[in-house]
UniProtKB/Swiss-Prot annotation:
Pathway as given in its UniProt record: tRNA modification; tRNA-queuosine biosynthesis
Similarity comment: Belongs to the GTP cyclohydrolase I family. QueF type 1 subfamily.
Enzyme class: oxidoreductase
Main location class: cytoplasm
InterPro entries, alphabetized: GTP-CH-I_C/QueF, NADPH_dep_7-cyano-7-deazaG_red, QueF, QueF_type1
Active site: 50, 57
Keyword Oxidoreductase: yes
Any GO MF annotation of the entry: preQ1 synthase activity
A cellular component term, taken from the record's GO annotations: cytoplasm
Name listed for the protein in its UniProt record: NADPH-dependent 7-cyano-7-deazaguanine reductase
Subcellular location: Cytoplasm
Catalysed reactions, semicolon-separated: 7-aminomethyl-7-carbaguanine + 2 NADP(+) = 7-cyano-7-deazaguanine + 2 NADPH + 3 H(+)
Length: 136
């Protein structure tokens, strides 16, 4: 069992906003490196802020990937995704940043990130980004 990160000032475990602020994507070894398989992760409560109005934007993120040597640890991924909650950033920029971080940390054979943003002002938006070569 791993030890929880401690707040330097209080020596209490980091919780809530403080642990989200320090979040990063963590990976662990792929338990079956010889097998080609896909993992699908759904993150239905993504939020960030519009860089122009400051209003919140909501999206459902879907990640499908074929792991190479590493797989993503889900709690760290959740906290990393939650870290965008108060950041003013465009849809295009945030989805590309998330994809860059996923590729840099996990180096999957292939990955697809879909972001389906909720309608605002009668306009909805969906972004799809791919990286790598899908293996059969």
């Amino acid at each position: 069992m791993s030890k929880a990160k401690l707040d330097d000032s209080t020596q209490r475990p980091l919780y809530g906003e403080r642990i989200i602020e320090e979040s990063k994507i963590i990976c662990f070894d792929n338990p079956n490196k010889k097998r080609i398989y896909e993992i699908s992760i759904q993150l239905p409560e993504f939020t960030c802020k519009c860089p122009f109005s400051g209003y919140p934007d909501f999206a459902k993120l879907s990640i499908i990937y074929q792991p190479n040597l590493k797989v993503y640890e889900l709690k760290s991924l959740k906290l990393y995704i939650n870290s965008f909650r108060d950041i003013k950033i465009s849809h295009e920029e945030v989805v590309n940043r998330i994809m860059d971080d996923l590729v840099n940390e996990g180096s999957p054979h292939w990955i697809h990130l879909n972001a389906a943003f909720n309608p605002r002002g009668n306009v909805s938006m969906q972004l799809d980004i791919f990286s790598g070569q899908k293996k059969n």
